[in-house]
């Protein structure tokens, strides 16, 4: 048995799969069961009572986590003129138009999020098939197609997380690193769940939040007490 397998097995013994943990305890267990040599990301999976095959039950949006993500987010902005300057002043890593489109067409993707002013979407549309599958296509629904590029850049840098329900009705999102203080991870998780509650489609019937689980990159999944999480909203 390899060292990594032994560590994973040891981590698994610390988690009772049949137990739903209070928020505070769940975060402590996630931190305790992380065993990788790198600073693992803490991820959340939320099972929603929706059927995303129906357009009126799609859940999509974004939230700025109060305690950030613990990583440097590389922001690219498609803009010209005054908006180009505004984006640069706000801290954007790359700003341009056709020049950036040409680089991306050549296979360059050294950025984590893309923002565009509405008047640039005709240009950005040329590379939609390249950006879309990578989750990088600017979209007005999550605030990445906007004339307020300065605010959008600052939000992305501060730890803005985009979410979208998958076919199985699950939303996956990062909420920080295992090195974060437990209180910061708790705050980020509550902020994410609150955003999901606000994004509830009117067509969704029955129980909306069915399950919440937490895990580190390499660690086991921990089931949370939903009522304890929502009580903090």
UniProtKB/Swiss-Prot annotation:
GO biological process: regulation of translation; translation
Molecular-function GO term, any one: structural constituent of ribosome
Nucleotide-binding found in the keyword field: no
Matches recorded under InterPro entries: Ribosom_uL1_bac-type (IPR005878), Ribosomal_uL1 (IPR002143), Ribosomal_uL1-like (IPR023674), Ribosomal_uL1/biogenesis (IPR028364), Ribosomal_uL1_3-a/b-sand (IPR016095), Ribosomal_uL1_CS (IPR023673)
Top-level taxon of origin: Bacteria
Pfam families: Ribosomal_L1
Keyword annotations from UniProtKB, A to Z: Repressor, Ribonucleoprotein, Ribosomal protein, RNA-binding, rRNA-binding, Translation regulation, tRNA-binding
UniProt cross-references to CDD domains, sorted A to Z: Ribosomal_L1
Any GO CC annotation of this UniProt entry: cytosolic large ribosomal subunit
Annotated function: Binds directly to 23S rRNA. The L1 stalk is quite mobile in the ribosome, and is involved in E site tRNA release. Protein L1 is also a translational repressor protein, it controls the translation of the L11 operon by binding to its mRNA.
Protein family membership: Belongs to the universal ribosomal protein uL1 family.
Quaternary structure and partners: Part of the 50S ribosomal subunit.
Protein name: Large ribosomal subunit protein uL1
Gene coding for it: rplA
């Amino acid at each position: 048995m390899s060292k990594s397998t032994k560590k994973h097995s040891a981590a698994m013994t610390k988690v009772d799969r049949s137990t739903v943990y209070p928020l505070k305890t769940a975060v402590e267990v996630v931190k305790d069961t992380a065993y990788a040599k790198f600073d693992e990301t803490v991820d959340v999976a939320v099972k929603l009572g929706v059927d995303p095959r129906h357009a009126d039950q799609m859940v999509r949006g974004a939230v700025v986590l109060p305690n950030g993500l613990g990583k440097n987010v590389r922001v690219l902005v498609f803009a010209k003129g005054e908006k180009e300057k505004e984006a640069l002043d706000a801290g954007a890593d790359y700003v341009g138009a056709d020049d950036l489109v040409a680089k991306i067409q050549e296979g360059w993707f050294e950025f984590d999020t893309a923002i565009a002013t509405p008047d640039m979407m005709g240009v950005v549309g040329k590379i939609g098939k390249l950006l879309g599958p990578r989750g990088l296509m600017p979209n007005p629904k999550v605030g990445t197609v906007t004339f307020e590029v300065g605010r959008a850049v600052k939000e992305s840098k501060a730890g803005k997380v985009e979410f979208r329900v998958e076919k199985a009705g699950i939303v996956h999102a990062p909420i920080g690193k295992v090195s974060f203080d437990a209180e910061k991870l708790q705050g980020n998780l509550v902020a994410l769940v609150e955003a999901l509650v606000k994004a509830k489609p009117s067509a969704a019937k029955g129980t909306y939040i069915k399950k919440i689980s937490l895990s580190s990159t390499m660690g086991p999944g921990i089931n949370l007490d939903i009522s304890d999480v929502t009580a903090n909203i």
